[in-house]
Amino acid sequence: MKPCIERLPRHLALAACVLALTCLPPARAADPALDRAAAAMKVDEVRTIRYSADGIGYTFGQAFRPGEAWPKINIRAYSRSIDYGTASMRDEIEFIRGEALGGGGYPHAAPQRNVELVSGGYAWNQVVTAPVPGSRFVAGRIHQLWITPHGALKAAVRNSASVRKATREGRTYDVATFAEPGRFTATVFIGQRGLVERVESRVPDPVLGDTPVVTVYSEYRDFAGVPFPTRITQAAGGHPTLALAVREVQPNAPVDIVLPDLVRAATERVTAEKVADGVWFIAGGSHNSVAIEMKDHVVVVETPLNDLRAVPALAKVREVVPGKPIRTVVNSHGHFDHSGGLRAAVAEGATIVTQALNKPYFERAFANANTIRPDALARSGRKARIETVDRKRVITDGVRVVELHHVADSHHSDTFLMVYLPKERLLIEADSFTPGAPNSPPPATPNPNHVNLIENLERLKLDVEHILPLHGRVVPVKELYTAVGRPSP
């Protein structure tokens, strides 16, 4: 997603680049090996495709402890529809948690259904009938579209892949290597029958930097004259992410994906609400931050998601607290949606404060550059400074006190921190409690994360009046107690 049309607004230039690359008429491969593979796979005949499957998935970036495997989900039904001509894809996934520990925000007992889309340079989720823009998903979904078996060959031809012979485990492959500029790099392994058997790709990631992804296609069958694998496995960042058994394939199925106007017009919105003297709630999107003004500097709690969110959030902090450097950024926990903006914080010159288990993981991650799409950290040339919290740490300038506490015994993350301002009686937390709509009834069964948060507040004897959640709105603490069916203290 490089801005190849410099005078357009960034989001329009992005879309124009993608469409310019993906809406061209089919090109013929210059290399005979790609020609043979295209003929074997019926690539030019496949304009759209839909396939359904079931199996196992894993929630990338949501490990219970840093470095552990991604949490497992059981996929009951999976449907993917692709229009290669418009670079559009729709995934419909029905699943249930496969294990208790780890993140993802999924119910602990009930099944969930996700509808995830991408078209050109835009991504969104469909929640009932409402589209929810998701710019942070564009890169990942475009990558997934173009590493499908037919997509990989189309992308290899379009990007003038270099082709060589290679032997692996006694088998000879035609190996095509190409780059989708600003998106990903890929190496496609084509077997002796001309079928795509493996794609090794690298994608930019807000936490890990350039990240290896390995996708394996096997047990091909003929579907209406088109070969397609019935087994798909994938790993990313060193751990499995997918294991599918494909049940049905429909080449050239009707695929009608319309980009909603709301998604096309969406921009990154950042707001600031003063909740106490020198304390600002930075909101406006799916993830929040908090700015805490000290005597001669600013402490920021959370730089989430990626540069697209973190950079304007930090700019908003400088706007509401002018003239003081952002010296410290506190990370609530290691899950990637909450740590994806830490590279931007390092580029800002801030010291990262995180739970002790995260430090070696973050040090390795931040030392691995994003070269495919350079981020703020890569451009800055700075090195990360990381300090830690085990169970408790206090930041003070002699006037304001900021307490950092480990959230013990959580099922969500073993590296959870919450931030407490005793004078202001404010609690800042992520994922332990996300407030529902105002006046909504409590769930029939209390959320274990809510119960765990109350247990920690009571164990530590924290006197809280309001909660500043890193998802959702500022609420009085009584809403937490109401959510678990208990009177507030």
Please provide the spans of the model-predicted regions.
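Zn-dependent metallo-beta-lactamase
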Residues: T241-K295, R393
